[in-house]
Swiss-Prot record:
Homododecamer. It catalyses: 3-dehydroquinate = 3-dehydroshikimate + H2O. It comes from the Bacteria. It is an enzyme of class 4 (lyase). This is 3-dehydroquinate dehydratase. HAMAP family: AroQ. GO terms for molecular function: 3-dehydroquinate dehydratase activity. SUPFAM superfamilies: Type II 3-dehydroquinate dehydratase (SSF52304). Pathway: Metabolic intermediate biosynthesis; chorismate biosynthesis; chorismate from D-erythrose 4-phosphate and phosphoenolpyruvate: step 3/7. Catalyzes a trans-dehydration via an enolate intermediate. It comes from Cereibacter sphaeroides (strain ATCC 17023 / DSM 158 / JCM 6121 / CCUG 31486 / LMG 2827 / NBRC 12203 / NCIMB 8253 / ATH 2.4.1.). Keywords: Amino-acid biosynthesis, Aromatic amino acid biosynthesis, Lyase. Belongs to the type-II 3-dehydroquinase family.
Amino acid sequence: MTTTIYILNGPNLNLLGQRQPEIYGHETLADVERRCAAVAAEKGFSVRLFQSNHEGAIVDQIHEARQAACGIVINPAAYTHTSVAILDALNAFEGPVIECHISNVHKRESFRHHSYVSLRADGVLAGFGIEGYELAVRRICSLCAGG
């Protein structure tokens, strides 16, 4: 069994820490990776972080994860509400999937309240800031270890 967890991030998350810090905070995607790697290492796992502004690139990473990852943490960002392609790719992945959002999407515009990804996710975290990623990694570690 692989002990790698894929952490996939969608559009505009490359600007984390710069774009709308009042919503998303001041920490960067590099901070997310560092914090998640530390949590995973405590449990004997590793992480592979990927970000793209392109839907097909995210789908390709999910396909790769079928062979290379025990679980996926995904923040599809705007694709949460629009991407059947990402949902279909996740449906082809057999391991656990946790959907993670930095902000509380249910407290924001109504179009953000619907998630295609939630139809596949084993759990959803929203509104915990980047700490949500750490919580998601802990849960994936537990699920991958049989818990």
